[in-house]
């Protein structure tokens, strides 16, 4: 029996669906042909209240996640993943309450970035930025982290909400993110050749992984996590 992968998703659902889709794509790339070749995935797409925008609902969100994990008897034998970067703020409480271990996408990204880069630019939700979820450990590892200004933060929030609701992202909003606009206007080869010193962009929100998938000079925690799981033999 394959090791069970549990995706704690729904925050938002488009992003956790993208993580699930890429897991299946990874299995196909590794030669999966029949049903039994694919990973055993339990995807909990949970209608969790928006505790990211409303901190007062954090306890309510935590209880929903814990109760769902109890219902499926989550244990140390499972590979448990939180599909939302910001929701990793709940990781210590979940692990302590249920005596389980979560395979952290955030930790995997921090480890990768700290080994490969001296400076990065962080694009993420305002909560991820303000809590230092990425900033603090990366800076402690000697990485310079460039964070969005206020206008960029507001634009990122609009982009994240658009992905969650499956709406088109207005070009006027994209134009407020200079780095992504630059990527959009140049192909990968010319951008890398002409701007080799530009710091790479860490997509510190899975909605941004959806919005800017495969853009040049980006670091995608979803892909880092998939490589980690592949190396560990989980996928």
Annotate each language-model stretch with its function.
Residues 1-235:
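Non-catalytic structural scaffold of enzyme domains
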């Amino acid at each position: 029996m394959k090791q069970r992968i549990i995706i704690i998703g729904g925050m938002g659902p488009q992003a956790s669906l993208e993580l699930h889709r890429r897991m299946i794509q990874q299995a196909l790339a590794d030669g999966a042909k029949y049903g039994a070749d694919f990973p055993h995935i339990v995807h909990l797409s949970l209608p969790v209240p928006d505790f990211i925008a409303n901190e007062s609902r954090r306890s309510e969100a935590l209880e929903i996640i814990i109760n769902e994990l109890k219902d499926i008897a989550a244990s140390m034998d499972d590979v448990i993943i939180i599909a939302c970067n910001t929701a990793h703020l709940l990781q210590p409480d979940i692990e302590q309450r249920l005596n389980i271990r979560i395979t952290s996408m955030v930790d995997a990204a921090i480890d990768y970035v700290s080994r490969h880069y001296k400076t990065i630019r962080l694009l993420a939700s305002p909560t991820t930025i303000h809590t230092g979820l990425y900033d603090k450990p990366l800076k402690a590892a000697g990485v310079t982290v460039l964070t969005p200004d206020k206008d960029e933060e507001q634009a990122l929030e609009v982009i994240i909400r658009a992905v969650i609701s499956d709406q088109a992202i207005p070009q006027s909003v994209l134009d407020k993110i200079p780095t992504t606009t630059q990527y959009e206007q140049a192909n990968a080869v010319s951008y890398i050749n002409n701007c080799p010193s530009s710091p790479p962009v860490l997509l510190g929100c899975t909605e941004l992984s959806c919005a800017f998938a495969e853009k040049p000079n980006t670091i995608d925690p979803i892909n880092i996590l998939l490589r980690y799981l592949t190396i560990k033999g989980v996928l």
